[in-house]
């Protein structure tokens, strides 16, 4: 599974050099390609193709007829999904349409999150980390107590 955060830069042609650690996981456990899609104006998601197929099936099974918010989210992920393959230098070309929709440009953080990768603008990632570290630990403990999660 994917883990860790890597500060990277998108080059002038829109290419991202994916760390060897992530490429190795993909080639050992999956195929050497990813599906990239837009989750929000703050980040792109990258899934191994096999994991994306599971997510896409779940998205297609969502009951969205009476829920415009869920329908828009479903459409956002499904309509923007594209398969990317590495070049010989281990880079992927991020589609121009997706780059245009996110509010980051060159300085990014590629984060491993279990079965996927997340591409954040560096400023947004830092703000997210500051917020997470500033959250009230008692409130977090209470919220975690309402779940089945055991750390």
UniProtKB/Swiss-Prot annotation:
GO terms for biological process: negative regulation of DNA-templated transcription initiation. Residues 5-51, 81-124 form the SpoVT-AbrB domain. Gene3D superfamilies: Transcriptional regulator MraZ domain. Pfam families: MraZ. GO terms for cellular component: cytoplasm; nucleoid. Belongs to the MraZ family. InterPro entries: MraZ, MraZ_C, MraZ_dom, MraZ_N, MraZ_sf, SpoVT-AbrB_dom, SpoVT-AbrB_sf. This is Transcriptional regulator MraZ. Forms oligomers. It is found in: Cytoplasm, Nucleoid. It comes from Neisseria meningitidis serogroup C / serotype 2a (strain ATCC 700532 / DSM 15464 / FAM18). Keywords: Cytoplasm, DNA-binding, Repeat, Transcription, Transcription regulation. Transmembrane segments: none annotated. PROSITE patterns: SPOVT_ABRB. One of its GO terms (molecular function) is DNA-binding transcription factor activity. SUPFAM superfamilies: AbrB/MazE/MraZ-like (SSF89447). NCBIfam families: division/cell wall cluster transcriptional repressor MraZ.
């Amino acid at each position: 599974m994917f883990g860790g955060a890597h500060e990277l830069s998108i080059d002038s042609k829109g290419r991202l050099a994916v760390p060897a650690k992530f490429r190795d996981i993909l080639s050992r456990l999956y195929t050497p390609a990813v599906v990239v899609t837009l989750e929000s104006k703050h980040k792109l998601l990258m899934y191994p193709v096999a994991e994306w197929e599971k997510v896409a099936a779940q998205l297609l099974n969502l009951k969205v007829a009476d829920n415009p918010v869920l329908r828009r989210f479903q459409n956002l992920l499904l309509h923007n999904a594209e398969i990317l393959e590495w070049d010989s230098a281990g880079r992927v070309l991020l589609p121009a349409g997706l780059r245009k929709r996110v509010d980051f440009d060159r300085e990014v953080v590629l984060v491993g999150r279990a079965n996927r990768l997340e591409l954040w603008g560096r400023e947004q990632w830092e703000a997210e980390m500051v917020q997470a570290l500033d959250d009230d630990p008692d409130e977090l403990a209470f919220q975690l107590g309402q779940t089945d999660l055991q750390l």
